[in-house]
């Protein structure tokens, strides 16, 4: 009855949105001469329907640059199609997802398809993700599940979640075995197209959670299998990686709050190894937070869909202690400091033995006025890396210092400015230091009466090599995040216009160009660009009805 009434109300009061995007480059990569099968234009179309915050539905279609449209392996038009339906809070049914969806339970040691933006940002917004079923409305072609998932309230304190997924994956099959899984979603060349949808993966599992007053407990389990054995080459640092054709992970998550203390964690096991992450947060006084995080990911623990806090990109082969503190002891000032001590019990990429490292960060933010703010951030990181020289291959420490100053200023609602200065210093034992500099200026203007908004940004960068590279975040299109990196010497400029004709029509266009002053070629291989300039334009149209 609830679902029928919800659909009737949705048909009458629901909101529709159509969003399309085009990216057009003004340069030609080498791959378009003989290798890539389609045009260099990127295009996506997204239709979404929403009723309040309780019903979502949508379709996504996407073609990456270089992929054919309506031809060859994409004879049905786009390279990627996605459908999703999410129903929330319908009586005892707390969530029901059909089509493409995402999952996150506990601290992510068993399963999490959330987007994480780095260790420091993750720690500062570290929350338990127990019982979250979400729609997959992005054009990400790998990090999702396809099937059905649901959460039901068994009682006031107990929730039960279950899910099933069946989907095709890209990869390489050799002699009847899967030797690699291809995660980029790119099918531009015949070689890439031959990897498309070669094998299937089925996954099923569930979560039981209990929450009463200050206590929260949960158990999450998943079982997944491929239709062919997964047998990648296991040598060196990858010796303990995933292999076989059926796998499982089981985890227990827990949380408890007492006065100013908050404790959360999860412990999980797999076919081999185990992992545990525990976090204690304490607020001694108002406007002060102290956080302690301990993680232990054994070298032979493997969870294909895990994503959690750490220095590395996987919840494997890492252990460490993290402490962070944020405080505002007096008016206008905010301070953040953190220190992470970590180690890797087994080999890693470019490190042929167990290694260790440290990561420290200090940031001071000063906001004397609502229209004026600034911060100074310093980060120090020490890790180890293999270096090959006259004495053979040695594992030596490397040191990375990063310094950033940013000033934000606004002149009413019409004009705002952001100035950023970056400095990088990278060196290793017995080797000369490499340095990187960057100056970035952004000016944003708003004309509300004309419904026109404009951003102009320019950067000058000068780095010695890749290790001393710099980053610059830019305003972009809706639902996108763009932070390119630069190495060498040159400048980058971008201009973005956003025009709202009315509450139904929105148009955004962005032009960007990067010019290198120290080279006549950009990139390598099929991505090689002849010349020192790289320019493109992006356009996006949104229609609400």
Identify the function of each model-found stretch.
Residues 117-128, 174-190, 475-480:
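Surface-exposed loop/turn segments flanking beta-strands in extracellular/periplasmic regions
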Residues 1-3:
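Short, small-residue-biased leader/transition segments that mark boundaries at the very start
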Residues 75-131, 137-170, 287-304, 450-466:
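Outer membrane beta-barrel
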